[in-house]
């Protein structure tokens, strides 16, 4: 499946409030088409990122400006979500401490943490999907213009907050520790998964369905090429997702 289609599918299936936060891939392609092809007129050359404001057309400037705006959009959203997750984790800790004597409350908290964990997986997917889109649209730009902007721009991207998922990984591990704390010690992982799958309300969760869709897209992106390069995504940090990927067909069937 082409990347543009995968991105559109993911946007359609993600949380409604996230839909305008993804890469404006279609708009970037439209702006790229307005740029005249120059590959036949000039040799390919590698430029520094700050050199792209010299001797380029208005259409190229508009394209590059949108790229910069997209980076700002990604960073603002990503940092905002990380800050929100820090607060929510603290709230979960407080609620767990107060609900230890109430099985009903603990079950409710458990479901909420599962959704919360899924949302953080969505944010990991958000980072990977937008990074991949930038790599692909910049490859098209280089091919059309004869310039080599992809490498310097991606080197800049690698330093951006939305690409740095270390804190997100830490938050995910903390949420998993909470789930281990809530689940009965004598309950095996397979029993826990089966119990959650059997709960109708849980399976109707928008977070659950969005997470499944995100995992499928993330799997497609990472399995699309076996060639490792400077533009490749880093190894996936969220432990346990490989096992979750294996369960995607079953999860999708149960979630319908």
From Swiss-Prot:
Alphabetically sorted, this entry's keywords are: Nucleus
Briefly describe its induction. Answer: Up-regulated under phosphate starvation.
Upon gene disruption, the observed phenotype is: No effect on Pi accumulation, due to the redundancy with SPX2. Spx1 and spx2 double mutants have an increased root-to-shoot growth ratio and a reduced rot hair size when grown in Pi-sufficient conditions.
Q: Where in the cell is it found?
A: Nucleus
Question: Which GO CC annotations does the UniProt entry carry?
Answer: nucleus
User: Boundaries of each SPX domain copy?
Assistant: 1-155
Task: Give the record's GO biological process terms.
Answer: cellular response to hypoxia; cellular response to phosphate starvation; positive regulation of cellular response to phosphate starvation
Nucleus: is it a keyword of this entry?
yes
Q: Where is this motif: Bipartite nuclear localization signal?
A: 30-46
InterPro entries recorded:
SPX_dom, SPX_prot
Q: What job does this protein perform?
A: Plays a positive role in plant adaptation to phosphate starvation. Inhibits PHR1 DNA-binding activity in a Pi-dependent manner.
Under the subunit heading, UniProt states: Interacts with PHR1 in a highly Pi-dependent manner.
User: What is the protein name stated in its UniProt record?
Assistant: SPX domain-containing protein 1
User: Which organism was this protein described from?
Assistant: Arabidopsis thaliana (Mouse-ear cress)
């Amino acid at each position: 499946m082409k990347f543009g289609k995968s991105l559109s599918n993911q946007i359609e299936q993600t949380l409604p409030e996230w839909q305008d936060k993804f890469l404006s891939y279609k708009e970037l392609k439209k702006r790229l088409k307005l740029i005249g092809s120059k590959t036949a007129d000039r040799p390919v050359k590698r430029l520094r990122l700050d050199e792209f404001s010299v001797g380029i057309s208005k259409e190229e400037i508009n394209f590059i400006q949108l790229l910069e705006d997209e980076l700002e959009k990604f960073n603002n959203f990503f940092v905002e979500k990380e800050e929100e997750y820090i607060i929510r984790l603290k709230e979960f800790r407080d609620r767990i401490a107060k609900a230890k004597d109430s099985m009903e409350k603990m079950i409710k908290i458990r479901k909420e943490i599962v959704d919360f964990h899924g949302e953080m997986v969505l944010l990991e997917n958000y980072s990977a999907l937008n990074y991949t889109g930038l790599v692909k649209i910049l490859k098209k730009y280089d091919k059309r213009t004869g310039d080599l902007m992809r490498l310097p721009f991606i080197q800049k991207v690698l330093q951006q907050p939305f690409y740095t998922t270390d804190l997100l990984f830490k938050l995910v591990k903390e949420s998993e520790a909470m789930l281990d704390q809530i689940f009965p010690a004598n309950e095996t992982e397979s029993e826990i998964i089966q119990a959650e799958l059997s709960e109708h309300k849980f399976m109707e969760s928008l977070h659950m369905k969005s997470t499944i869709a995100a995992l499928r897209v993330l799997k497609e992106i990472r399995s699309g090429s076996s060639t490792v390069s400077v533009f490749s995504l880093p190894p996936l940090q969220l432990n346990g997702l490989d096992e979750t990927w294996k369960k995607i067909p079953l999860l999708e069937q149960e979630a319908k």
